[in-house]
Regions:
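Extended, solvent-exposed, turn-rich assembly/linker loops in the middle of proteins
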Residues: 1-36
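Sequence/fold signature of self-assembling virion shell proteins
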Residues: 24-131
Length: 131
């Protein structure tokens, strides 16, 4: 949020953590006298909630060991269309077939499209290793 110069549209609204830490914050109570989990406490008491935005925390198996020195990673990012995009993958398809007399064969060309996540503004995503 600081890197986006405190613009509310740059405040992270999604957090991904490894499943073991997620299970811990879901099952562990805030205190012995508490009646809510750590996850519920975080979701109800955070800066995003105070500013009228909803924070979502999800488990992600790819966060396990993804950090430096095989430590677990946390990813905080803004999940909005203007900030994060992905190209829609297109199935592999046959685009052209032609006979080849010398090889006594048909040569067929195939084409497809794969996509990757595109971060449009790097101020809206952060990684934290070793959680």
């Amino acid at each position: 949020w600081e890197d986006s110069e405190y613009d509310l549209t740059g405040m992270a609204n999604h957090i991904l953590i490894d499943p073991s830490n997620y299970a811990y914050i879901v099952t562990r109570k805030v205190s012995e006298a508490g009646n809510i989990s750590i996850l519920q406490y975080i979701l109800e008491n955070n800066i995003a909630k105070n500013q009228g935005r909803d924070l979502m925390i999800y488990p992600c198996r790819w966060c396990t060991g993804a950090g430096a020195s095989d430590k677990n990673r946390m990813v905080a990012y803004v999940n909005e269309k203007e900030k994060v995009r992905i190209d829609i993958p297109v199935m592999l398809g046959r685009v052209m077939t032609q006979p080849d007399v010398q090889q006594m064969a048909y040569l067929t060309a195939y084409a497809g499209q794969i996509g990757q996540v595109k971060i449009m503004y790097y101020e809206t995503i952060r990684y934290k290793d070793g959680i």
